[in-house]
């Protein structure tokens, strides 16, 4: 008899290497329910080998088409005799241990010394050999042979995949040299659920004939000597020809070496890896200004349109719904601003005219008069300081400090007045007013980097810079404020 081996797979399939050789060659008698299932697909005996049980079980699944059309490794047997036999509504062909256990529960070991069973087995084996070629010729095909158990033990990290052509030994009385040569070849019977896809294939591989069987001259049939296939679930663990690929991997550790395809002679190198560097830039500005995400603008800053009662953001002068101009967006009386901005001695300047061109005196005259008054005050303070140095030496220092502070305050007020005069000298019809104070023209350019925004007056822009506020338009930090002159 031929020794059959079921290799140990990574998925945990049952290995016949752990089962005694006598048990592998033992005939089994299916239980009544399993026997009924086997006879429905052509079985005619009462005792079978494990190979024959798997063969007829595959024929039953193929005939009834119990497998899923899309995921064909799944077998549905809830409303079938197979479901009553296994006790499960469905199972996967990749669960080798589970399938072997379900089959083995429905078998009874038969003593080989019984003459009736052995004679029946021999007669049925001969009949099976005669009809074996007709039964398997339509479905024979090239398939990949998985490594034997000895190969898996010696090389657990690699899987050799070879293609073998099914062949049958026609002459039992070959020469010893030919038999020695043929015993290294494997005979495979391929029966698939779907012949077009070659899915769920039943493979029965005849193992090497032992030297003891050759010495004793035990007759062997190559079609029936292959007891149980390499894996107990290999008859259900085959994918379609297009889906045949290995999914072998190992858990990587510090001591593990680089993975290489030794069978194909290909090695993975660093050149095969492609590294892409992606840089993400955040947009600084957009075409449309949004005030909804601005934390400094609250609902109290929104203005209500008098025409349609729509609440609008503070900066746009027009209503977003009806496009009406905001009420009091521009001052009604345009002559009030220059009157407020002119100094006290502006009445005297307006009354005087130049003789040649009959024009009003320029603002430079007022500046000169202010400068003369400052000089007079400074000289008076110096004279009073000298006189008091002799009379009251104890209070001279306080007088000096007070006079200097008065001069500094006066100069500060004068510069502010000059800035207001310059700002108010622009015609309001030429430019829009400041969006912050709504009174002075937009002449304070907020500069940040190489760009700037002209949206406020010089005074309001300086206040923003002094308080370390960002630009109201683009939210960038303010670097400087530039006073802008218009022609």
From Swiss-Prot:
Positions of short motif Nuclear export signal: 190-202
Residues bearing the modification Phosphoserine: 166, 190, 240, 242, 246, 260, 262, 382, 391, 403, 425
Gene Ontology BP annotations: apoptotic process; negative regulation of apoptotic process; positive regulation of mitotic cell cycle; protein ubiquitination; regulation of biological quality; ubiquitin-dependent protein catabolic process
Region described as Disordered: spans on this chain: 1-21, 114-188, 211-237, 252-275, 369-397
Location of the SWIB/MDM2 domain: 26-109
Interaction with PYHIN1 and necessary for interaction with RFFL and RNF34: annotated segments: 150-230
Motif segment (Nucleolar localization signal): 462-469
Catalytic function, reaction form: S-ubiquitinyl-[E2 ubiquitin-conjugating enzyme]-L-cysteine + [acceptor protein]-L-lysine = [E2 ubiquitin-conjugating enzyme]-L-cysteine + N(6)-ubiquitinyl-[acceptor protein]-L-lysine
Positions annotated to bind Zn(2+): 305, 308, 319, 322
Compositional bias per record (Basic and acidic residues), positions renumbered to this chain: 126-148, 164-179
RNA-binding as UniProt keyword: no
Protein localization: Nucleus, Nucleoplasm; Cytoplasm; Nucleus, Nucleolus; Nucleus
Segments of this protein annotated with the region Region II: 242-331
Record region (Interaction with MTBP): 170-306
Main location class: nucleus
PROSITE patterns, sorted: SWIB_MDM2, ZF_RANBP2_1, ZF_RANBP2_2, ZF_RING_2
Record field: compositional bias (Acidic residues): 252-274
Entry EC no(s): 2.3.2.27
Positions occupied by motif Nuclear localization signal: 179-185
Region (Interaction with USP7): 223-232
Assembly: Interacts with p53/TP53, TP73/p73, RBL5 and RP11. Binds specifically to RNA. Can interact with RB1, E1A-associated protein EP300 and the E2F1 transcription factor. Forms a ternary complex with p53/TP53 and WWOX. Interacts with CDKN2AIP, RFWD3, USP7, PYHIN1 and RBBP6. Interacts with ARRB1 and ARRB2. Interacts with PSMA3. Found in a trimeric complex with MDM2, MDM4 and USP2. Interacts with USP2 (via N-terminus and C-terminus). Interacts with MDM4. Part of a complex with MDM2, DAXX, RASSF1 and USP7. Part of a complex with DAXX, MDM2 and USP7. Interacts directly with DAXX and USP7.
Annotated domain remarks: Region I is sufficient for binding p53 and inhibiting its G1 arrest and apoptosis functions. It also binds p73 and E2F1. Region II contains most of a central acidic region required for interaction with ribosomal protein L5 and a putative C4-type zinc finger. The RING finger domain which coordinates two molecules of zinc interacts specifically with RNA whether or not zinc is present and mediates the heterooligomerization with MDM4. It is also essential for its ubiquitin ligase E3 activity toward p53 and itself. Interacts with IGF1R.
Entry protein name: E3 ubiquitin-protein ligase Mdm2
Taxonomic placement: Eukaryota, Metazoa, Chordata, Craniata, Vertebrata
